[in-house]
Amino acid sequence: MKILILSCNTGEGHNSCAKALKIAMERRDITCDIQDTLALVSDELSRRVANAYVSSTQGSLFETVYKIGGFVSDKIDFHQSIIYGVNRLYANTLYEYIRDNAYDAVVCVHLFPAEAMTALRRNEMLRIPTYFVMTDYTCIPFLPETDLDYYIIPHEHLIEEFVEKGVPREKIVPIGIPVDEQKFTTRVPKSQARQQLTES
């Protein structure tokens, strides 16, 4: 089996989740690759989006944009958002990458590749299993307009929120956010931990 994990460089949480998934799969002898989705289009695009994201998280701008996204997502007819439209533009490039590398399944840890994968599924270009792993503790704006096989969410207490937003209940799997267990099982003396935290 060969799995593709699609991420984006918009905050390290998505990439950390992707790395944890890769480690877990490789321990089970599953071949797994991580790909920055936007870098398939161009490294420059990936850098620009990453820089725009980092800039948007300064001050209250991110919160404002997030709230606007939530409002718009709740009001639009699904599959008509500009987010879906933009990510649909590189769907063919993504399809060729998946086909050429013979992946058996795709896991998305970011909304952008989930939107592109949705476009591929709607056009019946892709018939392999697709998964979304939520890295936030809420249903993010525009997620309900995606159409993947399963949505892995952080906790069962969030099921109703995702259902109310439009994610089909039968597709929700509440098993948590993947983390690298080695980082949380290695004991570090308190003095060393304090020193590491103050150096950050």
What spans do the regions from the language model cover?
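Conserved N-terminal ligand/cofactor-binding loop architecture of enzyme catalytic domains
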Residues: 20-99
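A nucleotide-sugar donor-handling region in carbohydrate enzymes
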Residues: 149-200
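A conserved, positively charged/aromatic
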Residues: 98, 125, 141-151
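Glycine-rich phosphate-binding loop signature in dinucleotide/nucleotide-binding domains
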Residues: 97-103, 199
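Extreme N-terminal starter segment of soluble prokaryotic enzymes
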Residues: 1-4
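A short, glycine/small-residue-rich beta-strand->loop->alpha-helix junction that serves as a flexible
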Residues: 8-19
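Active-site proximal beta-strand in glycosyltransferases
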Residues: 105-114, 118-136
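Structural motif
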Residues: 104-105, 150
